[in-house]
């Protein structure tokens, strides 16, 4: 199973993740069976890319049907060609017996991904194109502080079910009170956005983070203060095609800001976020999210 409307950066599939808490909060998935073949190459300097052909059977595990020209699809096949490319133009690399490794990380870094359906191949049901882009920037200061910027954008053309559009990474439980909604924070998620609240066929996302030096309160209590702001903008083309699920769009924008106190004790921290702007909710408490953070420090 996989989260609906989530973006998977194929070139990141071999990235090393110690702990990713967000999946434990997700409640809406789709079942899929896929076969794929591809090639990974680092032929172009300072890039890594994956070129892939795949055929996927998809069955949403929630109340949803895709309406294409009056025909309702509750399950479907997607045959696609995809290229996913990471480009780190300012980093330094070293060639080793086991391959090329990044020895000095420098920013910005860029990731591109293009997916195209293949009509009349492998029982493919829909014709579409999907373009995704991401850039990351990080500035480390001599005093130990750090500023991080992240920008992502996605755009779809053609006919594509909700399962493969964009949800902009919500991470707020659909429960009544602030205490009931306390859960683990994601890395780059909208912490005040409820699951399945917004969907988009095109979107842009920006995140700003600034990390201050750790505050020495007690011998083992040294929290790391981080200020965070996030914003998103998007829209849904052909909304009449998506049947059975209620949602909103990001046409008016989405904004949240917050403070993280990470690694208060043994990697455990606490954070709070506030939702504001055009999509602010009527009840004050519904705009607040309190989260638990966890960071495992391996010492390198």
Residue ranges and their predicted role:
Residues 1-300:
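Exposed, low-structure sequence patches enriched in small/polar residues
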């Amino acid at each position: 199973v996989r989260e609906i409307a989530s973006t998977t950066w194929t070139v990141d599939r071999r990235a090393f993740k110690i702990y990713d808490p967000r999946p434990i909060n997700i409640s809406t998935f789709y079942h899929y069976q896929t076969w794929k073949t591809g090639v990974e190459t680092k032929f172009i300097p300072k890039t890594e890319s994956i070129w892939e052909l795949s055929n996927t059977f998809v069955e949403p595990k929630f109340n949803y049907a895709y309406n294409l020209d009056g025909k309702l699809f509750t399950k479907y096949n997607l045959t696609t060609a995809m290229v996913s490319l990471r480009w780190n133009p300012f980093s330094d690399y070293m060639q080793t017996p086991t391959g090329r490794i990044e020895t000095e990380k420098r920013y910005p870094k860029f990731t591109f991904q293009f997916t195209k359906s293949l009509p009349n191949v492998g029982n493919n049901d829909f014709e579409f194109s999907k373009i995704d882009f991401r850039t990351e920037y990080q500035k480390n200061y001599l005093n130990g502080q750090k500023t991080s910027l992240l920008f992502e954008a996605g755009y779809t053309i053609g006919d594509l079910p909700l399962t493969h559009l964009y949800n902009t990474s919500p991470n707020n439980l659909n429960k009544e009170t602030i205490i009931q909604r306390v859960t683990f924070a994601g890395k780059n998620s909208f912490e005040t956005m409820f699951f399945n609240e917004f969907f988009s066929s095109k979107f842009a996302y920006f995140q700003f983070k600034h990390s201050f030096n750790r505050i020495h309160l007690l011998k083992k209590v040294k929290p790391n203060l981080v200020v965070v702001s996030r914003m998103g903008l998007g829209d849904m083309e052909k909304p009449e095609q998506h049947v059975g699920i209620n949602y909103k769009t990001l046409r008016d924008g989405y904004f949240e800001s917050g403070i993280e106190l990470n690694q208060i004790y043994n990697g455990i921290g606490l954070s709070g976020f506030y939702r504001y702007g055009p999509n602010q909710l009527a009840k004050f408490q519904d705009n607040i999210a309190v989260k638990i953070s966890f960071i495992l420090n391996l010492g390198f």
